[in-house]
Structures are given as structure tokens and as C-alpha cells.
């Protein structure tokens, strides 16, 4: 683990599964017609800097589906690119407070932000709104899940968000997710 960054294995911490959830587990959950979106989540913290300004930030590694699954809005720019979850693009989306503290009155979109030992191009700014997975959205930096795996030197996900195609499908999707993970984790 990089000494400047900390990632967690909250799947074990939360007591939900005896084995870490991985991106491969999350990808397996996309294989049901009843599932509309899947967003793997890796969490950690790291020092972020732009110019002479530095601060500790909460980092979420995820996919393009995170925007819709969490019902987030953008204040500027775009969100994570769609595509191969295993490709760690060096792009990020930042919360409004991060934008304000690190970039001041200047534009953030298009600038390079250093997170730990990595440089990420800012492609979007999240609109100010509430909390998500216990963290103020204004204080988040969101990067592709593969980039988070490299940044935190870990493959353990915090959790996987799964969105059913309809409210009626939720019980079947829940059972399908449990069965799929049980099969992938040899009954655990």
C-alpha cells in the first residue's frame, strides 16, 4: 500500500462477506437481464494537490454507472467514461468543495490534479448535494475503479451497488446477487 494513500477492505469490515469483493465479482453481476446498472465501489483517502495547494481527500473508485445509481448531478464537465472496467484512465471528477479549495476561482475542468503519486485530469465537478456512502459529495474525488486499484494497491471493493430494472424485480435480483456471489466465493 502506498504510504500516501490508504484503501480499505470494508467488505470484511462490514461483515457482509468473508472474502473480499472484486471487480470480477461486480462484472459477474451485470449478467442478468433484470439488472440495469452495477457500480463497484472502492474507497480510500489520499493527499491531493494542485499547484501549492494540498489537502487530504476521500477517493471513490467506480464506473460510469455510479452517476445514475447514486442520482448525482454534475455542476460542470462530464463523468467517468464508459467502457472497460479494467482500463484505468487517469481522469477524475471532483466535489465542489475540492474544486473551491484547490482551484480557487479558476477553472478545474481540464486541469491536472495530483492524487498520491498519480496525476489525473479533472473532467467534471459534482453538484453540491448531500452525502453518499457516508461521505459529503462536495469532498469526494471519483476515479475509475481500475485506477483506484492501482492507487491503493488493492483489489478489495468496499461494496457493489446493483440497480434492478424495476421495483418488482428487486427480490429476484437480490436472490440472484446472493446466489452469484455464493457460487463465485465457493459457498461463502
Question: What are the roles of these predicted feature ranges?
Answer:
Residues 1-58, 65-68, 82-83, 100-101, ...:
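Hydrophobic, regular-secondary-structure patches
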Residues 64-84, 88-187:
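Mid-to-C-terminal secondary-structure elements
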Residues 1-9, 61, 77, 183-188:
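Proteins with a high burden of low-complexity, intrinsically disordered sequence enriched in S/T/G/P/A and R
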